[in-house]
Structure formats: C-alpha cells, structure tokens
C-alpha cells in the first residue's frame, strides 16, 4: 500500500451526495491501511465535513464566483473549475511526495494533466461514476472534447474503478478493460448488489497493490 495518497474530487462534489459518501468510504479504507490521505475539493459542504474520517487532510481550490452551481453536462465553466483544481493540485504535489493520485469523475482529467506536466510520473487511479458520455448530455464540440479527454485519461490510468457493469458498457470498449475493477458502494445493508464494507476495503487495497506492483524493466 502507498504511504501517501492525494484524492482529487470532481468539480461538482459539493452537490453530489453519492460521490461524497464514496470518497469518505475510500478515505476510511486507505486510513485503515495506514496511508496518509489528502483530499482536494473545489469547496467544502456540510455533508462532506460532517462525516469526514479523522486523519484525512482536506484542501480547497480558490473560489470562482461564477463557477458555484456547475451543470452536470460538460461546459466551459466546468473546464475552468477543473483548471483551478489543477493549479491547486500542482501546488500540493510540489510540497509533498505522494505515491498515488486518485481522481473522481472529472477529477481524473486533473490528475492526468498533472501527470503530463510534472517531471515525476505519478501513477493514478481513475474512478468514474458519471461518465461524460452519460445519456442526456448535449451533443456538440464541448461534449466531444470532454469525452475524448476522459477516454485519454482512462487509457493512461494505472487502474480504473467503476461502480457497475452498466457504467463500463457506456464506454463501448474504448478503455483498457484489463485495468478495470468493478467496485460497488459498501452499503450492502441498503442495496443487495452492493459490497459490505469489508469487501469494499479489500477491493480498494487490491487496486492499490496492483498500481504499485513491481514492474519488469523493459528489455
């Protein structure tokens, strides 16, 4: 397991209760393994701070007045919010040595961009719950660009986490399935198809062990 992880939330995490709960569950699983966990969010919300596991450090990005209520679909405002997250993320990795980055939804684009511009190569986990190709999103150049960036980020991810087979099917075989792990939420007491917390924590540990596995040197 890594000694230090930076989780980068999506640009809409403050209005997305399922993502907040998923991040909290992931933090708890990593802390249980002895990892130091930092979390970067665009801004805090009462739900996020109310149940935040003790031991995690939370950082926020500078506030942009007109990027408060972002649409679910790809937009220029979401792109700007992601860029601000990227700048804050760059500042964090410049001050602390993280072993793994973990992006959620469009936070995956942030960690991919960071991996490209820094001297050090960061292995990153890409976790997608609401693909930018989700049904109902408007078609157009912005959506096409967002989908292209998302798929590019997934192709270069050390590991990919998806919540179910339906989410995997939305990508239409355009991502490396060998690196995909299907990990449902750890709420089996509410939904039979979910994991127990123990199953969830074990699955997260296996993903990180896979990311940090020794690799054979190229011939």
Task: Pin down the residues of each PLM region.
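N-terminal strand-loop element at the rim of the active site
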Residues: 9-14, 29, 33-77, 166-172, ...
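A charged, aromatic-enriched C-terminal amphipathic alpha-helix characteristic of glycosyltransferases
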Residues: 189-213
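An aromatic- and histidine-rich active-site surface loop
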Residues: 45-47, 78-86, 90, 100-121, ...
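A short, active-site helix/loop in glycosyltransferases that binds the activated sugar's phosphate group
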Residues: 112, 135, 155-179, 187-189
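Nucleotide-sugar donor phosphate/pyrophosphate-binding loop at the beta->alpha transition
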Residues: 18, 122-123, 132-152
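N-terminal subdomain of nucleotide-sugar transferases
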Residues: 1-50, 151, 155, 159, ...
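Membrane-proximal helix-turn-helix segments that form the acceptor-binding/catalytic region
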Residues: 25-28, 87-94, 109, 117, ...
């Amino acid at each position: 397991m890594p000694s230090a992880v930076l989780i980068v939330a999506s640009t809409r995490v403050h209005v997305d209760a399922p993502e907040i709960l998923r991040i909290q569950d992931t933090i708890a699983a990593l802390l249980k393994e002895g990892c130091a966990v930092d979390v970067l969010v665009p801004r805090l919300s009462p739900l996020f701070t109310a149940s935040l596991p003790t031991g995690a450090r939370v950082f926020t990005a500078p506030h942009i007045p007109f990027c408060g209520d972002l649409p679910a679909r790809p937009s220029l405002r979401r792109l700007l919010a992601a860029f601000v997250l990227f700048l804050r993320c760059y500042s964090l990795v410049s001050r602390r040595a993280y072993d793994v980055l973990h992006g959620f939804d469009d936070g995956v684009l942030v960690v991919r961009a960071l991996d490209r511009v820094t001297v050090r190569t960061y292995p990153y986990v890409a976790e997608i719950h609401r693909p930018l190709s989700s049904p109902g999103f408007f078609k157009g150049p912005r959506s096409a660009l967002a989908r292209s960036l998302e798929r590019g980020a997934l192709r270069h991810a050390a590991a990919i986490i998806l919540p179910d087979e339906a989410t995997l099917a939305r990508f239409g075989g355009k991502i490396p399935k060998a690196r995909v792990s299907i990990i449902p939420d750890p709420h089996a007491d509410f939904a039979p198809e979910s994991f127990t917390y123990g199953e969830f924590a074990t699955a997260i540990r296996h993903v990180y062990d896979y990311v940090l596995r020794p690799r054979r040197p190229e011939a």
